[in-house]
Structure formats: structure tokens, C-alpha cells
Amino acid sequence: MERLAGKIILLSGASRAFVGFLAGLLAMFAQPPFGIFAAAFISFPMLVWLIDGVATHPDEGVVRRLLPAASIGWSFGFGYFLGGLWWLGNAFLVEADLFAWAMPLAVVGLPAVLALFYALAVLVARCLWSDGVGRIAALAVGFGVAEWLRSFLFTGFPWNAIGYAAMPMPLMMQSASVLNVATINMLAVFVFAAPALIGTGKGARVGLAVAAALFAAHIGYGYYRLSLPPPQPLTPERTVRLVQPVIDQAKKMDDRERAVIFEEHLALTAAPPQAGGKRPDIVVWPETSIPFILTDNPDALARIADVLQDGQILVAGAVRAEDAGTGLPPRYYNSIYVIDDRGQIVGASDKVHLVPFGEYLPFEDVLNSWGLSSIAANMPGGFSAASNRSVLTLPGGRTFYPLICYEAIFADEVDGSARLSDALLNVTNDAWFGDTPGPRQHFHQAQLRTIETGLPMIRAANTGISAIVDARGVLVVGLGYNYKGVTDAILPGKMPTMTDSMLRGRIFWFTGVFLLLVAAISRRGLNFRTN
């Protein structure tokens, strides 16, 4: 281990950047669909040793002293995000004649931009760097700050946060009932990076002992929580049917296929109950599953009424149109409708957190003012964002907290009012991304919201992964990717959580300050010995 550490420490220039890239790429294998937990225990020690090799001189300017560290962080981040987000390019091939030109911007450009956050992480860490366990704490602080900023800056994109690598299965997800993802990010980096101490010796006993204790607590708490009785269904029980139609995205966008698509959803809705099961009370369709403006098609509402049996409720993703006033084009919302057995819309909720460049064009007014209206007109999007999230109340009193598409990756989208609901509802359409890691990563991140909130999740996805997940993050029923069909299950009940979002936020700041003090004291000790 010492020999390997020495070789990595002595790297410089392009060799150092390339190894940083490989370390980031390796770290990505700890995320879904691979979930190779051990990969992070190799990649982060490599990162520590690369930073160890950054030599600075007092007579150099601040930029020259910090730039090598930032470049290491950027190389690591570029490998990590390129390996984890390449599948975004699939979306640009659905209408390749219009958008294939933009594919490199997503596949290479987005990882290059996101890598700047990890450049910042290493930059912060390098300012506090020392030669013992303090540098492990410094790296944890740096990544904690970077991942926290990534969760909200520029509308936020916390996809594949480092902490998810420490939670590959429900057993290792239970810490999220106590800590938020931001805290888990920091502690995960500390644990992943601690083996670097073996390669350099100093502080190894203390650092590895702390890392082992954190890891043991993480696993032990998971065993404890999963050993508790599973949450019991609320009374009266409600059976939920998930419809997974597997409609190709190109077909969804073909106007000639609209009627066929609608009838496919209805046929799956009307399928008989599964063997030994009861008739579903609630049927859930995926995001934008209704292929037209439903309020403009009374015949479609009548068809829904024909298919639904007495007392059944349909919850379906749809595009909702709203009159914007005389002479103005209508506003469109990515929405969820609740429809009763008479074909009446009895509830609706609109998406709050839209996808930049996918559902709306940032700075569209600026582009138009610069005379670039043709670019704005040819970009995807056109949705308006809701000003607030409306909880869906179903006939009979059940309440669902809606999360449309990638809203489910944002822990902060689920506020305190969610606990008043009976379940989280996530509808999505991942057909854009094909059979790639993307849909698996999306499901994994959505799954964690159940443990944070103590609520079960109902998840309907066009091409998968559709599932009902209980409040412990355990899969009750599910449909794999590209499996066309339905699955029914009784909706599980709630489960208490150890902390609320406010307390978790305080724990994050306390943990960050504590690690910062450890790093600062170690740094001060290094300076004292040097002088």
C-alpha cells in the first residue's frame, strides 16, 4: 500500500490528471446499476494521494498554489460525472434531426461543468490539508460543501451525490431516517478516504478506528431498523395498481399514435386482478401518459369512466392547459390528474421543479431580445412551473404527496407537510434515456425519499422502474425495466422517523463544523511543526 501511495503521490502533469480521471470513473461504479461498494474505497484513497502530491512554495501566488489541487478535483469529477451521466445523450436521439447537434453538450459539457463542484471540493480541502487524519476530515468538508451547493445552485442537480454510494441497499439506507443526504455525503467521504492513511502511516490508527465505527453504526442501525415490525397498511386498506405501458418515446411524440397509446393504458387498467388479489381501488399511470389535453377531449373522459369500475380512482400523469388571457398562448403544466369512476377530474397537481432545457428554456426572454428567437423556438420545453405543490386528495380521503419525474431526487422538495400525506407519489417517463443506467439511478434516489419521510412510495414509470416501496425503502412489488404490464399491492402504512428536516439540517452543520475543526487543528499542528 505504501509503495502504491508513493507512486501516485509522485505523479505530475498529464499523468496526475489522467489518474484523477480514472479515480473518478472508478468511483462511479459504486452507484447504480453496479453498486460495487468497494470501488469507493479505492477511488477516494487515490484522490487523497493525488492531493498529497501537490507541492506548494510560499513565494508562489495564491492561484498557482491552488490551481493544481483544483485541477485534480476537476479531473476526478469529470471522470465521475462522465461515467455516471453519459446516458443523457439518448434523449437527444429521440428527435435526432433536431437535437443530435446538442448531444455533446450533455454527454461531455454537463460533466465538465459539474466537475467544477468537485474542483471546489478539493480546493477547500487543500486549504486545510495536513499529513494525518486531518486531511481526511478536510476532504469530507470539501465534498460536503460542494455537494450541498450542487443540490440547489442553478436550480440544483444533486444526481448521484456521493452519499448514495454508501446506501446501495435498504440495509444501508436506514441512516437516512436520522441524517440528511448532505451529512451522509460528508461522512461517506471520510469513511471512503480513510484507507489512504494506511499508505502514508500517520494517523492511521485513529482515522481507521473512526471510519470503522461510522461504518459499523451505519450497518448496525440498518439491521436494527429492518428488524422492527414492517409498517402496517392504513385502514381501510387500499389496493394500488401500477400501469407500466412501455411506450417508446418516438411513438409517444407521434400524433397518429395518440388514440392507440390511450387505449393501451385503458386495456392495462381493465386487466383482471392478479391471482389471489382483490380488485385495485387506485390505478396509477405514469408521467404524461394521457397523450392529449384531456380537458379538450370529453370522449376520453367518458372512455375512462367506461373502464373504471364502481369506486375505482385513476391517478394519471397528463399535460394540463390553462388559459393565459386574451391574445396570449395558453400555459402548459406537467401535471397529475385524479379522475373518479364517473370520468370527472376531482383533483390535480402541477410540477414545481422543471428540468432546464428539457421542460423550459432558461433565459428565453434574453435569447429573444438578442434576436435568437429561432433558437428558443426550436428548443424543447414549453412548460410553466407551479408556484406551490398541491397535495392530491382522493375520494375516500387518501392523500398523496406528488413528485413528478426528477423532483424525486431532491430531498428538499419533500417538505414537512409531506408527513401529513399517506404516501409519496412519483410518476415519471424515463423512456427518453433507454435501457441505460439512468432509470436505475433515478429509482435508487427516489427510493431514499421513503426512508427520509417515513412514507411509502407509489412509483409509476412508463418504461420502468415502477414499484411500491414501503417506508423502510423495501420493495413491496415492482416491474423491471421494459416489462409491459401491471402489478397490484396493498398500500403500506407510515413509519416514524428519528428526526425532522430541521434537526437534520442542524446535524449537517454541526458535523461540518466539527470536521472543519479537526482539519484546522491538524493543519495548525502541521504549521507549528514546520516552523
From Swiss-Prot:
InterPro entries: Apolipo_AcylTrfase, C-N_Hydrolase, C-N_Hydrolase_sf, LNT_N. Residues 243-493 form the CN hydrolase domain. It is a multi-pass membrane protein. The keyword Hydrolase does not apply. It is found in: Cell inner membrane. It holds the Pfam family CN_hydrolase. Keywords: Acyltransferase, Cell inner membrane, Cell membrane, Membrane, Transferase, Transmembrane, Transmembrane helix. CDD domains: ALP_N-acyl_transferase. Pathway: Protein modification; lipoprotein biosynthesis (N-acyl transfer). The keyword Acyltransferase applies. One of its GO terms (cellular component) is plasma membrane. The active site is at 287 (proton acceptor), 351, 405 (nucleophile). Its EC number is 2.3.1.269. Gene3D superfamilies: Carbon-nitrogen hydrolase. The chain crosses the membrane at residues 8-28, 34-54, 74-94, 105-125, 128-148, 178-198, 206-226, 501-521. One of its GO terms (biological process) is lipoprotein biosynthetic process. It is an enzyme of class 2 (transferase). One of its GO terms (molecular function) is N-acyltransferase activity. Belongs to the CN hydrolase family. Apolipoprotein N-acyltransferase subfamily. Catalyzes the phospholipid dependent N-acylation of the N-terminal cysteine of apolipoprotein, the last step in lipoprotein maturation. This is Apolipoprotein N-acyltransferase. The gene is lnt.
